């Protein structure tokens, strides 16, 4: 009964906005989705540079799933739908080779709300129906998405209501404690952690007037520069 109630709570989240969660809790939630093989589509919201894509990659690696990472904002509608191939009296659509045809994995539609409406429309078919034209997503695949929010000064489009209502929405936040945990397990330079202990607000601080600003991703880049000497 307890397992049933847990699954029911997850199912009831579809189309609703969850409260903001930390990285660890989001990771636990995604692992539960995979464990119970729930094919509900997910939308991960969060500021740029906090590690949304990294969470999905970690889930794929932990569960031995293939990850196909599609930057939807860089695709045209025909890139997802494929191209028509004529025959004697009709034409069929040849799907793109980057879409999965077998196995198990995560089809990750990143930057989905940065894509123009025409592309979101094709993606909507993929998410709602798990198919586009004659192409069908294999049963062993999860379809997850991610995107930035308008308040992050991101160049995003409004998400169509039918598409938004299909998702389980997860809003991700970052914290210094979680970044320090990540740093401990990924050989992040002690000087970075010492500085962030002194200036915790500099872990993630968007500056709309500057192209460079601190984020967990930029601190990771800084660490690679420090490692190089």
Regions flagged by a language model, labelled:
Residues 1-15:
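Arg/Lys-rich, low-complexity, intrinsically disordered basic segments
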Residues 13-199:
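AAA+ P-loop NTPase catalytic core and its hallmark functional loops
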Residues 182-229:
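Conserved AAA+ ATPase small/helical "lid" subdomain
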């Amino acid at each position: 009964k307890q397992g049933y109630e847990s699954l029911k709570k997850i199912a009831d989240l579809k189309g609703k906005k969850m409260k903001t969660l930390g990285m660890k809790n989001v990771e636990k939630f995604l692992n539960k989705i995979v464990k119970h093989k729930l094919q509900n589509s997910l939308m991960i919201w969060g500021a740029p540079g906090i590690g949304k894509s990294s969470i999905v990659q970690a889930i794929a690696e932990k569960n031995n799933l293939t990850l196909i990472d599609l930057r939807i904002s860089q695709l045209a509608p025909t890139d997802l739908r494929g191209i028509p191939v004529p025959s004697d009296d009709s034409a069929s659509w040849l799907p793109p080779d980057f879409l999965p045809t077998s196995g198990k994995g995560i089809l990750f539609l990143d930057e989905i709300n940065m894509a123009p409406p025409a592309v979101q429309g094709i993606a909507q078919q993929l998410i709602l129906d798990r198919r586009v034209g004659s192409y069908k997503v294999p049963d062993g695949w999860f379809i997850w998405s991610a995107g930035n929010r308008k308040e992050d000064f991101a160049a995003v489009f409004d998400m169509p209501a039918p598409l938004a209502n299909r998702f389980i929405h997860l809003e991700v936040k970052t914290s210094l404690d979680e970044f320090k945990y990540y740093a401990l397990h990924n050989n992040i330079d002690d000087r970075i952690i010492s500085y962030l202990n002194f200036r915790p607000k500099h872990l993630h601080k968007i500056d709309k007037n500057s192209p460079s600003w601190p984020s967990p991703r930029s601190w990771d880049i800084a660490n690679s520069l420090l490692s190089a000497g």
